[in-house]
């Protein structure tokens, strides 16, 4: 058989033309040891901090420790499938999450993957989980209100757009309820919301999502969930992922509100990862950079300057205290980072004052500049009246023969405490809050028993809406109480007082 060179070269050329095998060039390493959600990997010399690496089976890991001869990787999936000697691939990507309108109405995990069973996200943009906070020049002072719909907060510890206001208190006294009410209050505003559940029970997160869906708030809300059963790495990443989603709106000149529920559990997750990575422990066994961990997260909430679009990201971080100890390490850290705190007290909660906000210990360091004039007019004396009432209440417990002025002050204080109570999931618009606080501050409630305040309030709203809509409309439109509105409100409340008197006899 004769071998012809032309034929052979022709066959080789055709085979080269049809050759379509892709060559996968990626830097790989080997797992040296694995345990407790941490893998030591040898051979990834060019790995970057916070880079995602891929283990067999598509499990992702986050590079946290860069050491001389190996890297420490926190695993974000099922650890049982990874063993010593496994190959690890670099992805070349720093941790990123999908952002934009596509994530609204969805429940995602700590890396932005959907977990609500509604199919894949059709997000076109992604954003790095870790971003540098805006500098001093890029910011503007807080000057626009961000309403929570809660009388006690909006009157005495007002929150402005771009502010960081801490919600702090023991377990099971309504911290999440305050945060969820703040989301519900944004229904007819231009604020998008992100709720980050960090280290919560799955049943609790499901309950929050069901509440948001029931009141139509999921349309403008994203829920980022890293539950207690998820790897510590996802619990650590979730707040940063949620923040990146909020920053997308902030940098587009829009407004966003983010709730971190709660940062105590994120700190515990970070402590766990740090100790397993053999980083030196500090106070309460937290790593030395735990303050930086929270400060770099909360500094990303800001009111941006007009040149950069005048957007804002408002943060409501939640911290859980142990037996009311606000002087513990994590609570003091976060108090010093934030622009004020709303302190919830078990004593008030069990006495039936809900939301259980301790007015004396709660402050808002920058919110006053953002408060509407109408609210300033009615809430100006409120804090002082309540503080004096608390003082007199303790004093009155010892003596019964009090002078008329003291009795009047006690009577006024009791009614003010009652009108600051509010049912869950019932945020109020500004005009309704102003109307009831106006009634309290001007003594229109003093003639009625303290236990009839809830009935008085409900009746007053419907009375004003039906018979004096101009008064409510003027407050909503002008955002202040003019002399005409003041006179109209007083006339309306006198008329309603006579009507209400007949109903309680």
Swiss-Prot record:
Record-level Gene Ontology MF annotations: ADP binding; ATP binding; proton-transporting ATP synthase activity, rotational mechanism
EC annotation from Swiss-Prot or TrEMBL: 7.1.2.2
PROSITE patterns, per database record: ATPASE_ALPHA_BETA
Catalytic activity entry: ATP + H2O + 4 H(+)(in) = ADP + phosphate + 5 H(+)(out)
NCBIfam families: atpA (TIGR00962), PRK13343.1 (NF009884)
Subunit structure: F-type ATPases have 2 components, CF(1) - the catalytic core - and CF(0) - the membrane proton channel. CF(1) has five subunits: alpha(3), beta(3), gamma(1), delta(1), epsilon(1). CF(0) has three main subunits: a(1), b(2) and c(9-12). The alpha and beta chains form an alternating ring which encloses part of the gamma chain. CF(1) is attached to CF(0) by a central stalk formed by the gamma and epsilon chains, while a peripheral stalk is formed by the delta and b chains.
Protein known as: ATP synthase subunit alpha
Protein source organism: Desulfatibacillum aliphaticivorans
Organismal lineage: Bacteria, Pseudomonadati, Thermodesulfobacteriota, Desulfobacteria, Desulfobacterales
Gene that encodes the chain: atpA
């Amino acid at each position: 058989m004769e071998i012809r060179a032309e034929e052979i070269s022709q066959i080789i050329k055709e085979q080269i033309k049809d050759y379509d095998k892709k060559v996968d060039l990626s830097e790989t390493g080997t797992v040296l040891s694995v345990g407790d959600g941490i893998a030591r990997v040898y051979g990834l010399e060019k790995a970057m901090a916070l880079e995602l690496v891929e283990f067999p089976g598509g499990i992702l890991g986050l590079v946290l420790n860069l050491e001389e001869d190996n890297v420490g990787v926190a695993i974000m999936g099922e650890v049982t499938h990874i063993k010593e000697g496994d190959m690890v691939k670099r992805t070349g990507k720093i941790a990123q999450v999908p952002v934009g309108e596509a994530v609204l109405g969805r429940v995602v995990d700590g890396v932005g993957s959907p977990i609500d069973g509604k199919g894949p996200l059709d997000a076109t943009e992604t954003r790095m989980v870790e971003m540098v906070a805006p500098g001093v020049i890029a910011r503007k002072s807080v000057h626009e209100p961000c309403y929570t719909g809660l009388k006690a907060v909006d009157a005495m510890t007002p929150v402005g757009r771009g502010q960081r206001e801490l919600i702090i208190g023991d377990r099971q006294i309504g911290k999440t309820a305050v945060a969820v009410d703040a989301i519900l209050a944004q229904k007819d505003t231009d604020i998008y919301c992100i709720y980050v559940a960090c280290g919560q029970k799955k049943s609790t997160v499901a309950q929050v999502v069901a509440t948001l869906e029931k009141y139509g708030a999921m349309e403008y809300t994203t829920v980022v969930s890293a539950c207690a059963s998820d790897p510590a790495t996802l619990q650590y990443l979730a707040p940063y992922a949620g923040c990146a989603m909020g920053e997308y709106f902030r940098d587009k000149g829009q407004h966003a509100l983010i709730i971190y529920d709660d940062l105590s559990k994120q700190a515990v997750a970070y402590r766990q990862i740090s100790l397993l990575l053999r980083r030196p422990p500090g106070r309460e066994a937290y790593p030395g950079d735990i303050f930086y961990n929270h400060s770099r997260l909360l500094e990303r909430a800001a009111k941006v300057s007009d040149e950069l679009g005048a957007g804002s990201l408002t943060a409501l971080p939640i911290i859980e205290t142990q037996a009311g100890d606000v002087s513990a390490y994590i609570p003091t850290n976060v108090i010093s980072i934030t622009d004020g705190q709303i302190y919830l007290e078990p004593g008030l909660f069990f006495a039936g004052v809900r939301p259980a906000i301790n007015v004396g210990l709660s402050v808002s360091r920058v919110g006053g500049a953002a408060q509407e004039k109408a609210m300033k007019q009615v809430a100006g004396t409120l804090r002082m009246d309540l503080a004096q009432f608390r003082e007199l209440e303790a004093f009155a417990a010892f003596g019964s023969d009090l002078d008329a002025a003291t009795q009047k002050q006690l009577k006024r204080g009791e009614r003010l405490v009652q009108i600051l109570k509010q049912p869950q999931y019932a945020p109020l618009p500004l005009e309704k809050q102003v109307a009831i606080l106006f009634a309290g501050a001007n003594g229109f409630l003093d003639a009625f028993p303290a236990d009839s305040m809830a009935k008085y309030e409900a009746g007053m709203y419907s009375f004003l809406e039906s018979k004096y809509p101009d008064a409510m409309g003027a407050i909503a439109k002008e955002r202040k109480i003019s002399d005409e509105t003041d006179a109209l409100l007083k006339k309306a409340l006198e008329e309603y007082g006579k009507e209400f008197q007949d109903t309680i006899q």
